[in-house]
Amino acid sequence: MAKATTIKEALARWEEKTSQKPSEAREIKLYAQIPPIEKMDASLSTLSNCEKLSLSTNCIEKIANLNGLKNLRILSLGRNNIKNLNGLEAVGDTLEELWISYNFIEKLKGIHVMKKLKILYMSNNLVKDWAEFVKLAELPCLEDLVFVGNPLEEKHSAEGNWVEEATKRVPKLKKLDGTPVIKEDEEEDN
């Protein structure tokens, strides 16, 4: 089997293709590398101007080495092999959007550090307990959540009470699974 692509190699390819210096670029796309990236290695720390980083559709197992990304606002890690959210603390003060659907995340430990997170797309993961889901209420700015395809959502959607139960536990949500959230008290005002 082919050896994994390193971040350094992927950045060199990206630089060649775009004629931009990775250290100066605001948006860097390293998705769907062949062979796939397996590790978020220390080369990421050179991306000091990066505001949007896409590493989706690779084989990354751990979130790591984000400490140099002082301006990161959008991180795309969908379709990888990520099992937990450890490693996000380095971008806790800047990250506004986390796209992490189609991974293997069961627990939301570590999510509370995301002080500015407004958008969380984490469909098709493995979250099955309300005890984990309620950790999302600790995010002061979270407004838009996509959670479809997690065992918890599937169970409660089948029972017909997903939206009601989810918005009760995370009341600040304005959008859930792509649909605007309509609050009971707002309906009465009309």
From Swiss-Prot:
Q: What is this protein called?
A: Dynein axonemal light chain 1
Q: Which domain of life is it from?
A: Eukaryota
Give me any GO biological process, just one: outer dynein arm assembly
Residues modified to Phosphoserine: 56
| Family the UniProt entry places it in | Belongs to the dynein light chain LC1-type family.
Q: Please give the InterPro entries that the UniProt record associates with this protein.
A: Leu-rich_rpt (IPR001611), Leu-rich_rpt_4 (IPR025875), LRR_dom_sf (IPR032675)
Location in or out of the cell: Cytoplasm, Cytoskeleton, Cilium axoneme
Give the multimer and partner information.
Interacts with ZMYND10 (via C-terminus). Interacts with DNAH5, a outer arm dynein heavy chain. Interacts with tubulin located within the A-tubule of the outer doublets in a ATP-independent manner.
